[in-house]
Amino acid sequence: MPTGVPILEYHMVDEVDPEEGWTYNVPPEDFRQQLDYLQQQGYTTITPLEFMKAKKGKLDLPEKPIILSFDDGYENNYTTMLPILEAHNMKAVVYMATNSIGRPNYLTWDELREMQDRGVEIGSHTANHQPLTHLDHEKQLEEIKLSKLLMEWNGIRTVFSFSYPNGEVSPEMPEMLKENEYLTAVTGDAGLNTFDTNPYLLQRTNIPHPRFGLMEFKLRLLKAAVMTKLGIHQH
């Protein structure tokens, strides 16, 4: 397989003022430039499920695969991000906190189902977006199980992927996710992923509001590769 698969961690793609505190927002024009750059560099987007299919020998990965991920499930993922994504013929995964569905500024059930029909993988970001490390075992199980069940009951095809709220992971979490039929989970640790990476501890590169334009984006991609090469990971 390639030397490693980067996973980019986005949240919002919208026209908002970063001075208002939206540090996790990438303006649409910056997002377009980032996707243009990825295409120029020969990257092809895949989903977490496709990564796992390739790991099991059921799918061949492209020469330079990359995963675009979006946490929380903001409505601008549908109204703003998706058209830009489709214009670049790219894929993504959206990790949804289910108790936010239908609330102001968040995705609705109809939007989630349509996004899945248009090639976006839908994953779980728990029910209440509470860091799982702050909960007891029973509450952790509830957050993991209920979010998956609720989405599948509401017409989302099988949910296989998970994102840890705040990127916080406890030692027992990978096994809990496996027992509840998840196939992958993403953390907040920077780095690249190979078939040897624990699929429940996949590493991501955070993409916040770009204060320094496209150069910052390029440096963040480079940082993930360097950290992997040096073996600087938490997991």
Model-flagged regions — what are they?
Residues 1-69, 75-78, 134-235:
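C-terminal active-site subregion of NodB/CE4 polysaccharide deacetylases
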Residues 8-12, 121-129:
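Histidine-centered catalytic micro-motifs
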Residues 70-71, 124:
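Active-site flanking residues adjacent to catalytic metal/cofactor-binding acidic residues
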Residues 95, 125, 187:
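Short beta-strand and adjacent tight-turn residues that come in two discontinuous sequence segments
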Residues 51-54, 77-82, 101-118, 146, ...:
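Alpha-helical scaffolding within the catalytic cores
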Residues 98-102, 131, 165-168:
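Short histidine/acidic/glycine/proline-rich micro-motifs that form metal-
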Residues 82-90, 107-124, 178, 196:
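Acidic (Asp/Glu)-rich catalytic clusters
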Residues 74-75, 128:
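Short, glycine/acidic-enriched loop or turn micro-motifs at the edges of active sites
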